[in-house]
Amino acid sequence: MSEDSSALPWSINKDDYELQEVIGSGATAVVQAAYCTPKKEKVAIKRINLEKCQTSMDELLKEIQAMSQCHHPNIVSYYTSFVVKDELWLVMKLLSGGSVLDIIKHIVAKGEHKSGVLDEATIATILREVLEGLEYLHKNGQIHRDVKAGNILLGEDGSVQIADFGVSAFLATGGDITRNKVRKTFVGTPCWMAPEVMEQVRGYDFKADIWSFGITAIELATGAAPYHKYPPMKVLMLTLQNDPPSLETGVQDKEMLKKYGKSFRKMISLCLQKDPEKRPTAAELLRHKFFQKAKNKEYLQEKILQRAPTISERAKKVRRVPGSSGRLHKTEDGGWEWSDDEFDEESEEGKAAISQLRSPRVKESLTNSELFSTTHPVGTLLQVPEQISAHLPQSAGQMPAQLTPVSLPPAAELAPVQAAQAQSSGAGSQETKIPISLVLRLRNSKKELNDIRFEFTPGRDTAEGVSQELISAGLVDGRDLVIVAANLQKIVEEPQSNRSVTFKLASGVEGSDIPDDSKLIGFAQLSIS
């Protein structure tokens, strides 16, 4: 980079960036390498789909401001951001070593994980640097919100930096800075999410990052988060109802864990305490005995960067469909292409694409990327140059269902709930689904037992949609959204083996009441009637 170009400000014109290979993707974003021609520097651009984020731009601007003021050797440098059509482009430093997740996948694919994926010294070295970054954020009043191996990046010199601080991590928790709303959107799987973030009862603070850090420690040793095999609703239920996970949770071959010692396991258990007040701070963790095993960045260069996939191996080339408007879509073979949103395969453009053996597009599904949706639209616009300004669309969230008005006598009758995403695609929309009749028994605000009867039609209704409508009708406390939805999902997935479940409510008990599962004080019972 020349002296003249280094003095230039970072451009907010998309034409100044030559987009190159896709180097990462998630539920709402794609990361591409790019070359900034005025600066003569290669960068990473995270392209966030604003249609899926359901967050006001006022709140996003606050997060961007926080990112721009963040300067630390263990935090990825943020350069600038701007809006292109319905995407927010975040321009950041490119770290050529890729993410720790890339390395984990590479090691597992080569079958080199039979005695654990990364050794203790490597894990300690990486996580010590992550803690340094987290300590900086927490001291400055920031919460990362999305600590995981996929967001820990490596430089070619063995340096370790945390990515996704700010906007994209902010979106992953629903974009609610105040933490005082019942409904939010969780993007992606909540495997790394702290219990208090899931419950959304009392809000959360930087200790949520410490829980995620503990899950990440397990991920670096075993190759995956403890509940990675389960769908999102099941992950929520397991995290909230079970004891905290450990190194062994979900691991079939316990032999692979033998080399991990007591100090590593103790450090994990300290992080994974359900009561956030009992978790250590980042500064306290840095003094833990386990981190005495940490080495320098040259050690990482030697131990894992030489085993890591190259940027070309990680990258997915982008195919360009002739005449396309320039929107990225993932194809079934794992590649990426530029094309129009409404792609007509009978058109000249479509025939040209097919003649080039273009892969079919992957059909998008909300079920694994959005659990709970807000009903409010995206807010004010981000002010950007006219040529790249974008009118953001309405929220893609669930529309409220129509419920028959009900009172709360001992046997309140609830009309069948018309949940969001009422018609599923494929065969399910053509077959007649048999509704499941259910009864939710719990105490109302007057401490009287009530039976709330309703029907759930598989393929039409969703557990989260039904739970939201029970709350909207005033039948269920808003704080119990997650736990009711999780147990409803449990029953409808396996109605034969789960005809009745009793579970603890997040709303708890009042005053001097003592929780009692048999009397349903602080508990609820959901049954097939």
From Swiss-Prot:
Q: Which SUPFAM superfamilies match?
A: Protein kinase-like (PK-like)
What is the required cofactor set for this protein?
Answer: Mg(2+)
Composition-biased stretches (Acidic residues): 334-348
Cell compartments where the protein resides: Cytoplasm
Task: Identify the catalytic residues.
Answer: 146
This protein's GO cellular component annotations are: cytoplasm; cytosol
EC assignment: the record states 2.7.11.1
UniProt-annotated binding residues for ATP: 23-31, 46
Query: What is known about what this protein does?
Result: Effector serine/threonine-protein kinase component of the WNK-SPAK/OSR1 kinase cascade, which is involved in various processes, such as ion transport, response to hypertonic stress and blood pressure. Specifically recognizes and binds proteins with a RFXV motif. Acts downstream of WNK kinases (WNK1, WNK2, WNK3 or WNK4): following activation by WNK kinases, catalyzes phosphorylation of ion cotransporters, such as SLC12A1/NKCC2, SLC12A2/NKCC1, SLC12A3/NCC, SLC12A5/KCC2 or SLC12A6/KCC3, regulating their activity.
Query: What is the protein's given name?
Result: Serine/threonine-protein kinase OSR1
**Gene it is expressed from:** OXSR1
| Catalytic reaction(s) noted | L-seryl-[protein] + ATP = O-phospho-L-seryl-[protein] + ADP + H(+); L-threonyl-[protein] + ATP = O-phospho-L-threonyl-[protein] + ADP + H(+)
Recount the PTM note: Phosphorylation at Thr-185 by WNK kinases (WNK1, WNK2, WNK3 or WNK4) is required for activation. Autophosphorylated; promoting its activity.
Top-rank taxon: Eukaryota
Residues with Phosphoserine modification: 324-325, 339, 347, 359, 429
Q: Which organism is it from?
A: Sus scrofa
- Enzyme class label: transferase
Which family is annotated?
Answer: Belongs to the protein kinase superfamily. STE Ser/Thr protein kinase family. STE20 subfamily.
Alphabetically sorted, this entry's keywords are:
Acetylation, ATP-binding, Cytoplasm, Kinase, Magnesium, Metal-binding, Nucleotide-binding, Phosphoprotein, Serine/threonine-protein kinase, Transferase
**Is the Disulfide bond keyword given for this protein?**
no
Instruction: Please cite one Gene Ontology biological process associated with this protein.
Output: protein autophosphorylation
Q: Which residues carry this modification: N-acetylserine?
A: 2
Major place of localization?
Answer: cytoplasm
Q: What are the top taxonomic ranks of the organism? A: Eukaryota, Metazoa, Chordata, Craniata, Vertebrata
